[in-house]
Each structure stands twice: as structure tokens, then as C-alpha cells.
Design a protein with these regions (language model features):
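Active-site-proximal alpha-helix that buttresses catalytic centers in soluble enzyme cores
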Residues: 1-335
């Protein structure tokens, strides 16, 4: 019998049935890849969809004969933005209050990672349908964030994707909350001489924002009839992604987590973002959640849990943000 802790996959949430189904599919793929070396694997969302994080934690706790114990939580986010730095830890802190004796180790975001670059390249090749890379400009579309560190990472991912793959050019942009926009990036590619563009959405699963990427790309193409524009598929649930999730699990369990906090807006007063330092973080609530009536108690408990977080590095190795001072990151409420 395995003595390793259960694995909790944490997603943001979406109202897209296809997005929920793809998340569920990935949870199943991760479970299958463990080969029994992880006693239990489950997943939940912090908002907008079921199962919630609370639902998943209840299941993992019930699966343990010796009580709550320890779990490993891996955030299914591509960049270390507000969800990964604040919203998900806040949701997990709430579960520490609900389940006395529960502790967790927190994995780092999935990206950037060579596995993701390879998946993106494969999706782009499918969209190219045999057309040469050298005549193709790639436009990578990130979600967009009020966290400059996360936005900068999209630029880094774009460069890593371009390096050594022979594309004619590569641009980055965002679908919400940040500039440049998708049309602006497409226009820049045209000014640089692009005649064929593949738009690559940097998203895990279907949802409102990926759909918006497709719509805006098609609208731009309609206004430029001599330009060939294709949209690559999403990263999606796949064996490669499941393997990366388990790599993050092993990192968290072994204490080998390497996060650079030097440009984190929640920790460092960056120009134009100083208001992010010093604001408390609170979890999202699902409709009908009984705990919503006790938000003040949970919020206070989160601050208590933060002290535990800082003091008990064994349970949260390498992840040393002070979540008590994280701002609740602005984001679009998606339908």
C-alpha cells in the first residue's frame, strides 16, 4: 500500500461544459498514470463549476483511513498569476479550517515547461496542415492578468516556443486584462510581412476566453482576405500534460520547488502595482456553500493558516509567498 499523500488537482473553473469535461478527463488520465503509486487522485474548481475544491477534499479525506493527514495540491494554471498565488491558496486555507489535521504541500504552476512548448508546437503543426514553418508567424495568446509577472511570462513562453523551431516570427498578446490585444498582435505580424499566421491559444481547456480568441482571429482574417489565418487547438487533456502534473506532484513531495519571487507583485512593490502589496486574500465561494455565511470567520482563519504556512515549510516547501498580503486579483467573471 502506498504511503504517499493523495493528489488534488485544482482548476479555476468555467461555465463551459466542454471545459469541465476536459478537466475531468485530465484527472482521470493522471489517476491512470500513477499506476497505484498515489493512493487517491481527485480534482476540483475554486469557482464557477463543480466539483468544487471542497467536494474534492471531502473525497480525499474520506479515502484516508487515518484521518485527514497531508495532501499535495497541484494548481492547474499555466502562469503564477492571481489564481495560483492567491485564490487557490486561499481556497486551500479554508479547507484547513474545515478539516482539522489536514495539511498540504503546494505545487508550482505548470508553465513554463518544455512539455508545454512541445504540445503547443504539435498543435501549431496540426493547424499548419503541412505548410512550412519558415513561412509562418505564430501569435501566442495568453489569458492576460493584472499581475505583470504573469504577463511577462507569456513573452518568455513565446520566445521559448520560437527558439529552434524555424517559425518565420512569433508575437505574444492577451485576450483580456492586458495589452497587446489579439487584433494588435495580428496587425503587427502583418506589418512584419506575415502572409500566414497561426494563432496559438495558451489555454489548458475550452471556455469563454478561448472561444473569444477564435472569434477575434476570424474577424481579423475576414478583413484581410490575402492573409491566411488558422487557430491552433488548445493544450487540452493529454498524456504529456498528465505526466507534467505528476512531475509537479513529485517536486512538491520532494521539496524541489524552485520559484522566483523577485518580480512577484504580491511581494515586491513594482512601479504601477504598489496597491497589490498589503491587501488580504479571500477565497471564492460556490453558490449554496454554507461557509459563505461565515466568510469573516474563514477570512480570519486564512490569516491564521498563513502563519502555519510560513512556519511549517515542511508542508509547503519552496512556496514562500506571504498569502496574507495578496490582493484578490481582478479577473473577468465568465459565463
Amino acid at each position: 500500500m502506498s504511503t504517499r499523500p493523495p493528489l488534488l488537482l485544482v482548476g479555476h473553473g468555467t461555465r463551459s461544459d466542454a471545459g469541465v469535461a476536459e478537466f475531468t478527463r485530465l484527472v482521470g488520465q493522471v489517476r491512470a498514470r500513477t499506476g497505484g503509486r498515489v493512493p487517491a487522485v481527485d480534482g476540483g474548481f475554486i469557482e464557477l463549476a463543480r466539483p468544487s475544491v471542497a467536494d474534492a477534499v471531502v473525497g480525499l479525506v474520506a479515502a484516508r483511513s487515518g484521518g485527514p493527514g497531508r495532501i499535495v495540491a497541484v494548481p492547474l494554471v499555466l502562469t503564477a498569476a492571481g489564481h495560483g498565488k492567491g485564490d487557490i491558496p486561499a481556497a486551500l486555507a479554508r479547507e484547513l479550517v474545515r478539516h482539522p489535521g489536514l495539511s498540504y504541500r503546494y505545487g508550482r504552476p505548470l508553465g513554463p515547461h518544455p512539455v508545454l512548448q512541445n504540445i503547443l508546437a504539435a498543435r501549431i503543426d496540426t493547424a499548419l496542415a503541412g505548410a512550412p514553418r519558415r513561412d509562418t508567424h505564430v501569435v501566442l495568446v495568453g489569458r492576460g492578468s493584472t499581475d505583470p509577472d504573469a504577463n511577462a511570462e507569456i513573452a518568455k513562453v513565446t520566445r521559448l516556443l520560437w527558439e529552434g523551431r524555424g517559425y518565420g516570427g512569433a508575437e505574444f498578446c492577451f485576450i483580456s486584462l492586458a495589452e497587446p490585444s489579439v487584433p494588435a498582435a495580428l496587425h503587427r505580424a502583418v506589418l512584419l510581412g506575415a502572409r500566414r499566421i497561426v494563432v496559438a491559444p495558451y489555454f489548458l481547456f475550452p471556455g469563454v476566453l478561448p472561444d473569444r480568441v477564435v472569434t477575434q482571429s476570424r474577424e481579423f482574417a475576414a478583413g484581410h482576405p490575402r492573409l491566411e489565418v488558422a487557430v491552433a487547438g488548445l493544450i487540452g487533456a493529454c498524456d504529456e500534460l498528465a505526466g507534467l502534473v505528476l512531475e509537479r506532484y513529485d517536486e512538491a513531495l520532494g521539496g524541489d520547488i524552485r520559484m522566483n519571487c523577485d518580480t512577484c507583485a504580491y511581494r515586491v512593490a513594482l512601479p504601477g502595482f504598489t496597491d497589490k502589496v498589503g491587501r488580504p486574500q479571500v477565497p471564492h465561494y460556490h453558490p449554496g456553500d454554507e461557509a459563505h455565511r461565515h466568510a469573516a470567520d474563514i477570512h480570519a482563519a486564512h490569516h491564521d493558516a498563513t502563519q502555519h504556512h510560513a512556519a511549517n515549510i515542511d508542508d509547503h516547501p519552496g512556496h514562500r509567498h506571504d498569502h496574507a498580503v495578496h490582493e484578490h486579483a481582478a479577473h473577468e467573471v465568465l459565463s
